[in-house]
Each structure stands twice: as C-alpha cells, then as structure tokens.
Design a protein with these regions (language model features):
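Aliphatic-rich helical/repeat scaffold segments used for oligomerization and domain docking
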Residues: 1-223
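Conserved positions within tetratricopeptide repeat
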Residues: 4, 93, 137, 141, ...
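Inward-facing hydrophobic residues that define packing positions of alpha-helical scaffold repeats
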Residues: 7, 22, 96, 196, ...
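Inter-helical turn/loop elements of alpha-helical hairpins
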Residues: 102, 106-110, 156-162, 186-189, ...
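Residue signature of alpha-solenoid helical repeat architecture, marking inter-repeat boundaries
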Residues: 190, 206, 210, 227-230, ...
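Amphipathic alpha-helical segments of tetratricopeptide repeats
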Residues: 200, 240-241, 277-288, 318-327, ...
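TPR/Sel1-like alpha-solenoid repeat signature
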Residues: 252-263, 269, 275, 282, ...
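C-terminal non-catalytic interaction modules
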Residues: 478-481, 485-538
C-alpha cells in the first residue's frame, strides 16, 4: 500500500527528484508513532507514506479522514460518514471520492467504504491529535443518532404494526435515511448488519446509556430478517445493562422481553422462559396491562414449545381477551393464532382449523405476509393430518413463496419443514429431501439447533419411506440425540418412534407419559399397538 501511494505521488510529479521524495516522506513521519517502535523499517515506511498522503489532502477531506477513524464498525456508507462529519451527504460523497483516489480509503462496493486496518489506526490517531475533545465526542454521538433514527425508519417496514419507541430528535446535522419500500429497508439492514453490535458497544463504552438501550431496542426489529438471533443477543444484553443503570423499569422490561425472544430464536427455551418471567414481573409491578398481556403471550410461546399445552391455552386466552379489550387487533390476532397452534398440537384439529382459517383471512386482508406464511404452515399441517396431502402441498408452497418477498431465512427454514412433510406425503420424496436439506442448512447458519434437528428428522422419515433404512436411522438417531440434548422430549419421542426399535418405542412411551391430550393418547396407543404386533411376529 505504501509503495502504491508513493509511486502514484512520484508519477503525478515527474519533476520531483527521488532524494526530494525521500526527504518529504521522512519529514512527515513525526506525527504518527502507532505503527512502529522506531526500529521497524517496514512499519516506519508505511507510517511515513500515510503521513505524507494525509498532509497532501485538502483540509475538509483530511477532517473527514480523521473522523472516519471514529466510526464504530468495519464498513460505512456516505450517510454514516456525513453524520460523523456533520456535513451534507452530497459534499461528503465528493470527499469520500477524494479519499478513495488518494488510496486512503477502499471502496469494496457501490456506496460502501472501508479502511485498511493500518489506515484506520492512523486515522484514529490523527483524530486524537488534531481534533478538539468536543469534536471527538460529538462525532460518535452524531453517527449513533444516525443509526438509531435510520434503524427506526427501517423497522417501520420490517415490523409494520409493531410498537415504536418515542425518540428525541437527532442532532440537527444528522440526516437519517428514509425508505420507499420493504426491499430498501432490508437492503440497508443487510448492509449495516455488521455495524450494529459495534455501534451499541461504542455507545456503551462512551457512557451514552440512552443511546445504548434505545439502539438495542430498535435494532431488534431493524435487524436483517435473515440475521441469526445469536448475533443480536450481545446487543440486547448491553441494552439491558443500560436500562438497569438508568433505573428505567419499562425499558428494562422491554429489553428483557427481546433478549428472551433472542434466546427462543436459537432454541434456548429455558433462558427465554426466565427472561419472559422477569419481564412479566416488572410489568405487573408497573400495572402495565398491555405489557402484561404481551409478556404472557410470549411466555406461553415458550410453554407451547415445551408442550405445556393446558397452561399455554389458558394464558393465550387471557392475553387475547386483554388485547381485544384494549382494541389491539394485531396482538389479539397473534394470540388467537397461538391458540390454534395449541389446539393443533393437542390433536383437536376440528377446533384448530376454524381459528387458523379466520386468522388466514385477517392476514390476507392486512397484507401481512409473515403472519400469513406462519398460519399457512399450520393449515398445511392440519390438511396433511386430515388426509389432504395435495392441499397441504399447495398451502405450504404458498407459504414458502411469500418468503421470497420477505427475504427472511428464519421463516423460510421453518416453512420448508411444512413443505418437506407435504412433499413426502404427496409422493415427491426427492423434492422433500431437497426441502429438508435446505431447512437444515438455514437453521445451522441461524443457530437454531432444534429446528435443524426437525429437518434431519424429516429427512430420516423420507429415507425410511424409500426403504433406505441405514440412511434413515442415521438421520433419526442424530435428530433424537439433538432433541434429547435440548430437552425436547416430545420431538425426541417422535424421532424414536420413527426409528421403531423396541427400545426406542419404550423410551418414546416414557417420554410422552406426562401428556394427557388427545394427540399424546393416540400416539401412546399407536406405540403400544406396534409393540404388540412385533411380539406376535416373534
């Protein structure tokens, strides 16, 4: 890099002698000592070239270069750079071009910029040396303002209908991005994803506690739809610490709730349940009826995954009643959809389907593709169990089709489980294996081991139907082991039942012994009947 910059300077001034060039480099080396202990010749050469190139910049470009060293993340766009500088975006783009032309900044993609690590260190050192302390403190605040308000604008598209925080206006020199549509918001979120954690970390390190908790709260809904829940958890933990530091109990409950949702997204149900329990306790203490209903609903989602069906049904019913009383149609609809899932899991299909169809109509009316896809997944499962495999296939395929618009791998991976099951039942084993394989890959990347295990389980059942017993057993054993490790006794029992060995069936019966719903009773009867048939064959 140093040779490239020096060579370009030499070419741009062919009348300059080599001795003059070397003298200039040496003279400009004094201001920066970050790269060398003084006896490292290579580092010293790089340092002096950086200094020389920096000193050749116009003052406004040099100032931008310095301030960019204070950006918290690895890459940035012109709007974030403008916020750091407190300058108009159009002028900032011109200055960025100047820095790229001087090889002090790289441009890996259109409207994206990054430093070489050594240049970042140099820029940061120059900011410390040449910028007044007030300017060094104001620039990071401005860029954090920009992230907060742009993320807030993005979540309006990414989580329509969700609750938005009241925010103070940004610094007058900050121009947040406005989005025309969903895809623009997703594009921004995906580009900036790697900056979210560093931004919140920078806010925490600077003692900007209000920025810290608000950024964390807003970024839950503004994160890229296909982001891993594990990526957000450290963001949420920092926000939670900031809320506690402020003694802001509503903010603490909100962050606790979202940390719980993050744990659930990666299959950590015990941690999720504890977070929702704490959020519920705070909201009860505050007398926040809507918040209590929200925490109750989320707590019961975890109970549902743990198959505590009676408790989940009772609590979902309570939450739905509160939301309805408060005129909150969207969360009331979510609670009703969750009730339909409870009834399906209990084997009460005649109750589950009418609720699911009503929610489907509501989501279609509102144009809520995420909600629609989720309820279509449930309807597909109901159709499959009631002997309508072709209908189940069409329904699951529609759900996955909606994901293409949403660009959400979390939803795609989940809905592919329903599509794979329908494809297998409809006599399309090859297609089913493709769906389960992609679901497994997506869930592995997202860090959701429980759903990854469900994809293995689905593949194992397809292989079993094809008579490829060795491959079936390998997938099913792997799935059963993962479910056991995660404490998911119901799905472990299903995997063991599919394996079909006498020891497997006995273990499955033990696992589902606590369940008293119609589905569990029917499965126990099936397991016992299979055991009797096996004994008669002997």
């Amino acid at each position: 890099m140093a040779l490239r910059i020096a060579g370009e300077r030499a070419v741009s001034d062919p009348h300059a002698g080599l001795d003059d060039l070397i003298a200039d480099l040496r003279d400009e080396s004094a201001p920066w000592d970050a790269l060398s202990t003084g006896d490292d010749a290579d580092a010293d050469a790089v340092r002096t070239v950086f200094a020389w190139s920096y000193r050749a910049l116009p003052e406004d470009a040099a100032r931008l270069f310095r301030l960019l060293g204070l950006h918290p993340g690895p890459t940035f766009g012109p709007h974030a750079a403008a916020a750091l500088a407190g300058a108009p975006p159009r002028r900032t783009r011109q200055l960025l071009d100047t820095l790229v032309g001087a090889h002090l900044l790289d441009q890996p993609a259109s409207h994206r910029y990054e430093f070489h690590d050594l240049l970042r260190a140099y820029a940061t050192a120059q900011a410390r040396q040449d910028e007044p302390s007030e300017a060094r403190e104001a620039a990071p605040r401005r860029v954090l303002d920009w992230y907060l308000h742009t993320a807030d604008a993005a979540q309006e598209w990414l989580a329509p209908g969700g609750e938005r925080l009241p925010l103070d206006p940004p610094d007058e020199a900050v121009t947040p991005v406005a989005f025309r549509d969903y895809d623009q918001a997703v594009d921004w979120s995906e580009r900036e994803h790697a900056n979210f954690l560093p931004a919140v970390r920078a806010a925490e390190a600077a003692g900007l506690v209000h920025h810290t908790w608000r950024l964390a709260a807003v970024l839950w809904h503004a994160q890229a739809p296909s982001a891993s829940g594990a990526d957000w958890l450290p963001v949420g933990e920092m926000g939670l610490r900031a809320a506690r530091h402020l003694g802001d109990r509503p903010a603490e409950a909100l962050l606790m709730e979202r940390v719980g949702m993050g744990h659930a997204r990666v299959g950590r149900l015990a941690e999720s349940a504890e977070c929702h329990r704490e959020a519920l306790a705070i909201r009860e203490e505050l007398g926040d009826r809507e918040g209590v209903a929200e925490s109750t609903n989320l707590r019961c989602v975890v109970a549902l995954r743990g198959r505590l069906l009676a408790e989940a049904e009772r609590r979902f019913t309570e939450a739905m009643a509160v939301f309805t009383e408060l005129g909150r149609e969207r969360p009331a609809g979510i609670a009703r959809a969750n009730l339909a899932v409870v009834r399906f899991q209990a084997g009460r299909l005649d109750e589950a389907e009418p609720d699911a169809r009503a929610i489907e109509a509501l989501h279609r009316e509102r144009g809520d593709k995420a909600g629609l896809g989720n309820i279509l997944r449930l309807i597909s499962a109901i159709e499959l169990e009631t002997g309508r495999p072709e209908a189940a296939l069409r329904t699951a395929a529609e759900a996955v089709e909606h994901e293409l618009d949403l660009r959400d791998h979390t939803l795609e991976g989940y809905w592919l489980l329903a599509l794979g099951a329908a494809q297998g039942a409809a006599g399309l084993p090859g297609d089913a294996l493709v769906s389960f394989q992609r679901s497994a890959v997506l869930h592995r990347r997202l860090g959701n081991r429980g759903r990854e295990a469900l994809a293995w389980q689905g593949a194992g059942e397809v292989y079993a139907a094809l008579g490829r017993d060795e491959e079936a057993a390998a997938f099913l054993r792997r799935a059963a082991a993962a479910h056991r490790e995660l404490g998911d006794r119901w799905n472990e029992a299903l995997a063991l039942e599919a394996l079909g060995g006498p020891g497997d069936r006995e273990r499955a019966l033990t696992l589902i012994a606590p369940d008293d719903d119609p589905r569990a009773a029917a499965r126990r009867a099936r397991l016992r009947a299979a055991g009797r048939r096996r004994r008669r064959r002997k």
